Amino acid sequence: MQYKEVAGGICAPKGFAAAGVHCGIRANHSEKYDLALIKADVRCAAAGVYTTNKVCGAPIKVDRAHLTDGYAQAIVVNSGNANTCAANGVALAEECCELVGKALNIDAKDVLPSSTGVIGQPMVIDPFARGIPAAAAKLAADAQGSTDAATAIMTTDTHKKEYAIQFELGGKICTVGAIGKGSGMIAPNMATMLAFYTTDAAVSPALLEKALKTVVPGTYNQMSVDLDTSTNDTLIIMASGLAGNPEITEENADYDAFVAALTAI
């Protein structure tokens, strides 16, 4: 199967915009971007794969609850605080989803939160109350939007990570884009790694989840740096279906091609 590298990262597929802003989440008062927002024009088939650690971050608990129907429309990510082992963690993650829902005029249950950073630190809603509306106002469906979001999810990373490819499904050009973070503490089985995929391919929620779970063991779970498994490992994909290919609803040649494209990313 042939692929073409394209610019734009998570904003390369049709129907997606992204942003990154600084809102003051880090305890050291760093001016770095620390909040990313990814928004789809339509409700998307969505799936996630998470840490195997018995202790998981509050956002993962919320993600699992929000993904029971297999759909989502936005992802909100903060860096600098893991929102793990905090008494109010789940409530705060849900409140972040409410803020995103209000800012984007979508259902809060269609928002998937994610966090990375220091474990066990207090976390308050104030930075999110400032940052989420700012990120919503800054959303851009272009390469800069993807780059800003990729920058905002970094912690100890020395380089941002984003990529996108195009391929053909059912006679239509489809695109998959991704951003990720992970530098130190990314082992075994992903550990402190976040990755967010967008695609305009039409894939049913069930087959999207199956494809993601097929790809992860031979790709992300092979990474090893310092033998720690994080509480916050997260890989989420949203599929807008706007490429116009026949929806993948069974394991056929198009499904195999889609899995191959995810593996290539």
Task: Identify what each model region corresponds to.
Residues 1-91, 95, 101-265:
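A structural signal for small-residue-enriched, beta-sheet-centric alpha/beta enzyme cores
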